[in-house]
Structure formats: structure tokens, C-alpha cells
Amino acid sequence: MDYQNIFNQDFYPTPENVIADMLKMSDIQGKIILEPSAGVGNIVDYLQKAGAKEVIACEINDKFRAVLSGKCEIVGDDFLSMAKERISHIDMIVMNPPFSMAKDHILHAWEIAPDGCEIISLSVIICNNIQS
């Protein structure tokens, strides 16, 4: 797959060592986990290898959804329109959201996560003025 044009649209596959760092304080064994902006499935692959009971995903890009369809159940395309009821059975949300929409993805995850659900997100914080 040619990722060249897609990288300009906030796609960046998460390296395995970064995923390992994201999850080093969490127990994913036997958990049902949502990856809401799954891309080509790097996080999905890692979670499955590490012992998750089930991994489900959302992905808005048609080409990426085609890649993911052989890896896990795809429960939606646009995560930001995902209803709370659709994921009421999950234990965790693990994500590396698009930089340009990271805040929206994190806040939406917080709004729809079932009680007791752990949310783990990779994100970049850019400070324009540290004093403010």
C-alpha cells in the first residue's frame, strides 16, 4: 500500500515499541479492547499478540478498513459518531488518534466509555506559551 499521500492526512502507524510503552502499566489479558482510529492495524496486531480477548476497531479510511477486515471486527467508520451503546461491553480503549483531531477523539472516548473502562491514548501536546 502506498502510504505517501495518506501520511499527509494524519496517518502515522504506531511503532511496536511505542505501543509497548503505552501499555506497560496495563493488563490487557482477556480484555475486550476498542481501537477507535486503527489505521492499518499496528495497535490491533499488538493487542491480539499480547493476549486481548477481543479487539474491535473503527477506521474512517476505506483502504485501511479493507486491511483491517481480516484482522478484527470493524464496529464503525467514524469514531466521533460512535454511540455509547455500541461499545458498552468493552474494557479498554487504546488509541493513537490523528494529530489534528486528537482532542476530539480523547474527549469522545471519555464521553462514551463504559464505567470502569480504561482509556490509553498517545497524544502530542503543543504549548505555544508556557506561561499562560
Language-model-detected regions and their locations in the chain:
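Class I S-adenosyl-L-methionine-dependent methyltransferase catalytic core
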Residues: M1-S132
